[in-house]
Amino acid sequence: MPGLPLLLLLLWGVGSHGFPAASETQEQDVEMVQKYLENYYNLKDDWRKIPKQRGNGLAVEKLKQMQEFFGLKVTGKPDAETLKMMKQPRCGVPDVAQFVLTPGNPRWEQTHLTYRIENYTPDLSRADVDNAIEKAFQLWSNVTPLTFTKVSKGQADIMISFVRGDHRDNSPFDGPEGQLAHAFQPGLGIGGDVHFDEDDRWTKDFRNYNLYRVAAHELGHSLGLSHSTDIGALMYPNYMFSGDVQLAQDDIDGIQAIYGPSQNPSQPVGPQTPKVCDSKLTFDAITTIRGEIMFFKDRFYMRANPYYSEVELNFISVFWPHLPNGLQAAYEVAHRDEILFFKGNKYWTVQGQNELPGYPKDIHSSFGFPRSVNHIDAAVSEEDTGKTYFFVANKYWRYDEYKRSMDAGYPKMIEYDFPGIGNKVDAVFKKDGFFYFFHGTRQYKFDPKTKRILTLQKANSWFNCRKN
């Protein structure tokens, strides 16, 4: 590839004392970085013709722009996290330079739009494709004055097709993985049209690529939306499947800024993505897992690793597709390398990213809770004793992980053995011999030997935030 050694020097920061032989993998990564920046960040494919110093700076600035968009550490170099992000399947619409057909911010002038499915993927039945597309349109019509009608022939406002490779729109697909689909802004001709890459496998569940999920995203472009930096938004460029497809509040705000709210008497409200450095952040559940700490909120996890300053935020379904959103408790049993998750009167068990078969199971038959207990507020297990503490309202139970039975004499009042933490526990975990209890925005570091609170901090103090 022309200019590849120069780009290797530029991006990997090799000094002027010599140029090491680039591995085949490294050359492939450089080629991928170059194509990614050309496709999604408007790095012109003739950038190497620019004078050296200016061209070098342009490539680095585009890489920094990409890192900033995805909330990565801005280095201007293709580090491991940047390469990982670039390799994720995504929408083919650029992040900073849209498929512009008309100047300004295009929108449909009429509120009654038509769509036509020109052909069907063999991966799904026609009925499944029709249903996925109809549901995707419904998401947007629920929050706007827009209505959508399917037509079977002729030209529609939004034409939908499954194509592969070069399909004569100046935006060829790249085969399996990579670009999944793309769509064009509102306008005449190709404006509003949606193309799905037939080289990808389309499904109606969590496997491969969920057609409903991708269609809902692409139709956002068809209506005039660009990509969002909010990882919880449907308009986030990378493919995410969280089990339930819904518009985040960020999506709703964006589309209503173009078309206004729906005419429904009650306006739909979407979920918001937690901000790790929000001083008002609270948690649904927390657990240790193989030396890391995972915090759960709604449909998201936040992952704190002692060796990294960055906090990873993503959908729970990325790790465990079958777990529900809104988990209420979680704990680690280190000697079995298991994590148990609780919601309502059900629980699930995983080992690493592997979801064990036979779940969910019932907490009453498995642990011996009385029928009056319909959910667990928080749970934590002690590795040295094999004892697990379950917190429910203002009481707690103690369970023996080796005997697989509840200890006698329980429940007890929380305030008796854990004085000062209050009568309600939202989440808890144990680290280095201390319990960390969470209630609302507060976190209590508790010494079980002295039964004293050692420190009181904000709940998100584990996230290296500058201000709390």
UniProtKB/Swiss-Prot annotation:
GO process terms (BP): cellular response to UV-A; collagen catabolic process; extracellular matrix organization; proteolysis
Cofactors (names): Ca(2+); Zn(2+)
Disulfide-linked positions: C277-C465
Positions bound to Zn(2+) 1: H167, D169, H182, H195
Protein residues bound to Ca(2+) 4: D284, Q328, D377, D426
UniProt-annotated location(s): Secreted, Extracellular space, Extracellular matrix
GO molecular function, one term: metalloendopeptidase activity
Binding site residues for Ca(2+) 1: D123, E198
UniProt binding sites for Ca(2+) 2: D157, G189, G191, D193
Residues where Phosphotyrosine is found: Y359
Chain positions of motif Cysteine switch: 89-96
Propeptide: 19-98
Cofactor binding, note field: Binds 4 Ca(2+) ions per subunit.
Pfam families: Hemopexin, Peptidase_M10, PG_binding_1
PTM per Swiss-Prot/TrEMBL: Tyrosine phosphorylated in platelets by PKDCC/VLK.
InterPro entries: Hemopexin-like_dom, Hemopexin-like_dom_sf, Hemopexin-like_repeat, Hemopexin_CS, M10A_MMP, MetalloPept_cat_dom_sf, Pept_M10_metallopeptidase, Pept_M10A
Binding site for Zn(2+) 2: C91, H217, H221, H227
PROSITE patterns: CYSTEINE_SWITCH, HEMOPEXIN, HEMOPEXIN_2, ZINC_PROTEASE
Listed GO CC annotations: extracellular matrix; extracellular region
Protein activity control: Can be activated without removal of the activation peptide.
EC category name: hydrolase
Major localization listed first in the record, in broad terms: secreted
EC number(s) stated in the UniProt entry for this protein: 3.4.24.7
Family: Belongs to the peptidase M10A family.
Domain remarks in the Swiss-Prot or TrEMBL record: The conserved cysteine present in the cysteine-switch motif binds the catalytic zinc ion, thus inhibiting the enzyme. The dissociation of the cysteine from the zinc ion upon the activation-peptide release activates the enzyme.
Record-given protein name: Interstitial collagenase
Gene that produces this protein: MMP1
